[in-house]
């Protein structure tokens, strides 16, 4: 009996269209991989900038050299660049985040050996730093560490080419120890380089099986902004595979969206990576610290210590922080806070007996107080003519007659030396030609009466503060600049309010001068009022004054130690005795703001807008608040959903004015969002009456 013929079904051949689609998909995947690899170039250049400027506070020093710094990034960056002070401080903190987590592990695991696996290592020279016996930084780890660098095959090959052509690095690693095999393409006694695409979970699983750690060896995985570019399920698979290895730790540093994807910094950050064809894919699934903690516990790491980068900054030794602050002039605190709140440093382990020491454990983040707040104040984005003219930050403004606003000086890419006139519908406002104040930012511009405006202080750079003062005076239908008596000490990021009878009260700021000063326009002199000498001189506080009640209010601002204050102080000014009396001081988490603005909106109600906080990123319910001054009750003004999603304002370096009809305008300002680009504001209106488009022109 003959057997039945066996039918073998062959796979259908691809059509020409399917082949083209497949080839296109492969090309797209390769291009995406190259774009992700390209992020290494920018990152390593920024770290080289830090290495050159911050060498004395990096902790890498040649042994016995009396403090001579040891450099490693220089081998991987052919043309060094100098980044901005904010980017430098941010990358210094990133380097410190990884080093601090490794130090925590070393201190908490006795004398056990530690295998460090750097996932998506790029050109990171961490192994060379901590294997270099001529570097003081190595000594604290007592020769306990060995390293595995893991990255795309092309990137690992380029890194190894640099290593093999650099005698100093070869000397640190020592000679080859055994043949390389499988994904491991280079091996010495304390170092391995492995070529692996982390998107290939099977390949990564095979790689981890090749480590063969001893039962008493600690395995540490580092992912510094590497899993962030992967789809969340693939990144989770990596973390879960690492969690199956006994005695393992995972150090994660990547982006957060603490106020959601629509907040201005987050929106700018996401757009930057998307436009560079390296979109952040995991952050939308794990946008907050608490969600990252849940993630790690679900994937096998039950013991988690996580915080944002500002929590890390606050945990550092105060002497070290002081040294960092002294490296280069720095006046970008708002941008630094914004950066810090958008990055997490998480240290997770499956060793339930491991304890995070007191100097490493992050305190639990307090719950946002916004849940107890509510308001239905209407808001809308106002149409403006030539909106690009609003691109200026840290200027100062006044309202003159007919609700025309003068927005003076400030900064775009450079300091501006002009005035933006807003709302002058008939074009009648003019300033005559003649001597005028030079360009500046962080100054004050205060209306003393209908014919006199007082400008004082500011800065050109953090090391070039200004002490000059000017009056803008109306004579014969035209406005004229007149120089008046200068300050004894320069001052910027200060406050100035009109207290009546041609007098201006100047408070705080960066200065060696008095906490309070009075400028008397009639006599063209300054003098100190009588005030409690214990009252702090704060920088970038919010200050306003209400003539009807003869009450002034000072909120937030930075103290001498750069801690941001969380108090609202009520004071009275007595013009007869030229004295200031502190009437009341209250505290609230939402008062803790640096760079906020305030105005008394109506009897007994004060509006507080914007600024930044060390402990939270302000969102659609906390960016704008109103205080009932008789009860100190805080109400949060909810920014409408459509406005927040499409036009959320970055309330830094902005201006706030109240118009004759009670309408409040918030305008100008913005910030450079770390290395991701700038975000600029339009005009936001608070009030019940719709207003017409606002014309803008430059004087």
Curated annotation (Swiss-Prot):
- Identify the EC number(s): 2.1.1.290, 2.3.1.231
| Alphabetical keyword list | Methyltransferase, S-adenosyl-L-methionine, Transferase, tRNA processing
Q: Where does S-adenosyl-L-methionine bind?
A: 94, 120, 151, 197-198, 224
Q: In which pathway does it act?
A: tRNA modification; wybutosine-tRNA(Phe) biosynthesis
Q: What Gene Ontology molecular function terms does this protein carry?
A: tRNA methyltransferase activity
The catalysed reaction is: 7-[(3S)-3-amino-3-carboxypropyl]wyosine(37) in tRNA(Phe) + S-adenosyl-L-methionine = 7-[(3S)-(3-amino-3-methoxycarbonyl)propyl]wyosine(37) in tRNA(Phe) + S-adenosyl-L-homocysteine; 7-[(3S)-(3-amino-3-methoxycarbonyl)propyl]wyosine(37) in tRNA(Phe) + S-adenosyl-L-methionine + CO2 = wybutosine(37) in tRNA(Phe) + S-adenosyl-L-homocysteine + 2 H(+)
Keyword tRNA-binding found: no
Pfam families hit by this protein? Kelch_4, LCM
Disulphide bond pairs: none
* Any single biological process term in GO: wybutosine biosynthetic process
Q: Matching InterPro entries, A to Z?
A: Gal_Oxase/kelch_b-propeller (IPR011043), Kelch-typ_b-propeller (IPR015915), Ppm1/Ppm2/Tcmp (IPR007213), SAM-dependent_MTases_sf (IPR029063)
Function text: Probable S-adenosyl-L-methionine-dependent methyltransferase that acts as a component of the wybutosine biosynthesis pathway. Wybutosine is a hyper modified guanosine with a tricyclic base found at the 3'-position adjacent to the anticodon of eukaryotic phenylalanine tRNA. May methylate the carboxyl group of leucine residues to form alpha-leucine ester residues.
What is stated as this protein's family in its record?
Belongs to the methyltransferase superfamily. LCMT family.
Protein's name according to its UniProt entry: tRNA wybutosine-synthesizing protein 4
Native organism is Eremothecium gossypii (strain ATCC 10895 / CBS 109.51 / FGSC 9923 / NRRL Y-1056)
Query: Mind giving the lineage of the organism this protein is from?
Result: Eukaryota, Fungi, Dikarya, Ascomycota, Saccharomycotina
């Amino acid at each position: 009996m003959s057997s039945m013929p066996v039918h073998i079904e062959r796979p259908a051949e691809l059509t020409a269209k399917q082949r083209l689609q497949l080839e296109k998909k492969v090309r797209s995947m390769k291009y995406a991989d190259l774009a992700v690899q390209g992020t290494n170039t920018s990152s390593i250049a920024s770290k080289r900038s830090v290495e050159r400027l911050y060498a004395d506070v990096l902790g890498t020093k040649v042994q016995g050299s009396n403090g001579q710094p040891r450099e490693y990034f220089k081998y991987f960056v052919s043309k060094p660049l100098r980044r901005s002070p904010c980017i430098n401080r941010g990358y210094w903190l990133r380097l410190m985040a990884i080093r601090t987590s490794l130090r925590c592990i070393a201190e908490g695991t006795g004398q056990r050996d530690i295998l460090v696996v750097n996932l998506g290592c790029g050109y990171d020279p961490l192994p060379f730093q901590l294997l270099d016996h001529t570097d003081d930084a190595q000594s604290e780890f007592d020769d306990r560490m060995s390293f595995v660098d893991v990255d795309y095959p092309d990137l690992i090959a380029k890194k190894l080419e640099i290593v093999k052509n650099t005698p100093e690095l070869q000397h640190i690693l020592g000679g080859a120890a055994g043949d390389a095999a499988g994904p491991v393409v280079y091996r010495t006694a304390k170092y391995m380089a492995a070529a692996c695409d982390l998107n290939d979970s099977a390949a990564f699983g095979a790689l981890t099986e090749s480590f063969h750690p001893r039962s008493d060896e600690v395995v540490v995985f580092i992912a510094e902004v590497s899993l962030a570019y992967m789809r969340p399920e693939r990144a989770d698979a990596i973390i879960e595979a690492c969690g199956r290895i006994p005695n393992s730790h995972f150090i994660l540093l990547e982006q957060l969206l603490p106020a959601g994807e629509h907040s201005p910094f987050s929106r700018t950050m996401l757009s930057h990576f998307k436009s560079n064809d390296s979109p952040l894919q995991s952050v939308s699934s794990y946008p907050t610290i608490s969600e990252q903690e849940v993630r790690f516990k679900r994937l096998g790491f039950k013991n988690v210590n996580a915080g944002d980068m500002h929590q890390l900054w606050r945990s550092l030794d105060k002497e070290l922080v002081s040294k960092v602050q002294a490296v280069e002039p720095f006046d970008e605190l708002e941008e630094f806070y914004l950066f810090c709140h958008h990055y997490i440093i998480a240290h997770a382990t499956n060793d339930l007996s491991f304890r995070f020491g007191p100097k490493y454990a992050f305190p639990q983040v307090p719950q946002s107080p916004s849940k107890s707040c509510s308001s239905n104040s209407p808001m809308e984005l106002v149409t403006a003519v030539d909106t690009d003219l609003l691109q200026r930050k840290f200027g100062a403004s006044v309202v003159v007659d007919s609700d025309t606003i003068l927005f003076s000086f400030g900064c775009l890419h450079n300091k501006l030396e002009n005035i933006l006139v807003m709302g002058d519908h008939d074009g009648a406002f003019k300033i005559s030609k003649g001597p005028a104040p030079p360009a500046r930012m962080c100054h004050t511009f205060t209306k003393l009466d209908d014919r006199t405006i007082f400008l004082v202080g500011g800065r050109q750079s953090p090391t070039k503060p200004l002490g000059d003062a000017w009056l803008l005076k109306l004579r014969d239908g035209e406005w004229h600049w007149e120089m008046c008596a200068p300050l004894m000490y320069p001052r910027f990021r200060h406050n100035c309010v009109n207290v009546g009878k041609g007098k201006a009260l100047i408070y705080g700021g960066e200065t060696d001068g008095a906490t309070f000063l009075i400028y008397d326009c009639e006599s063209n002199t300054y003098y100190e009022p009588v005030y409690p000498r214990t009252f702090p001189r704060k920088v970038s506080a919010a200050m306003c004054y209400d003539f009807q009640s003869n009450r002034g209010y000072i909120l937030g601002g930075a103290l001498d130690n750069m801690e941001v204050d969380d108090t609202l102080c009520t004071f009275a000014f007595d013009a007869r005795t030229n004295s200031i009396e502190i009437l009341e001081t209250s505290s609230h988490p939402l008062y803790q703001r640096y760079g906020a603005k305030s105005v008394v909106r109506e009897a007994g109600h004060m509006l507080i807008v914007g600024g930044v906080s060390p402990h939270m990123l302000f969102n659609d319910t906390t960016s704008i608040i109103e205080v009932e001054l008789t009860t100190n009750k805080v109400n949060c003004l909810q920014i409408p959903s459509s406005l927040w999603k499409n036009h959320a304002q970055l309330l830094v370096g902005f201006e706030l004015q109240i118009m004759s009809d009670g309408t409040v305008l918030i305008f100008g300002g913005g910030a450079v969002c770390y290395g991701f680009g700038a975000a600029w504001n339009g005009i936001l209106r608070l009030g019940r009456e719709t207003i017409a488009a606002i014309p803008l022109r430059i004087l």
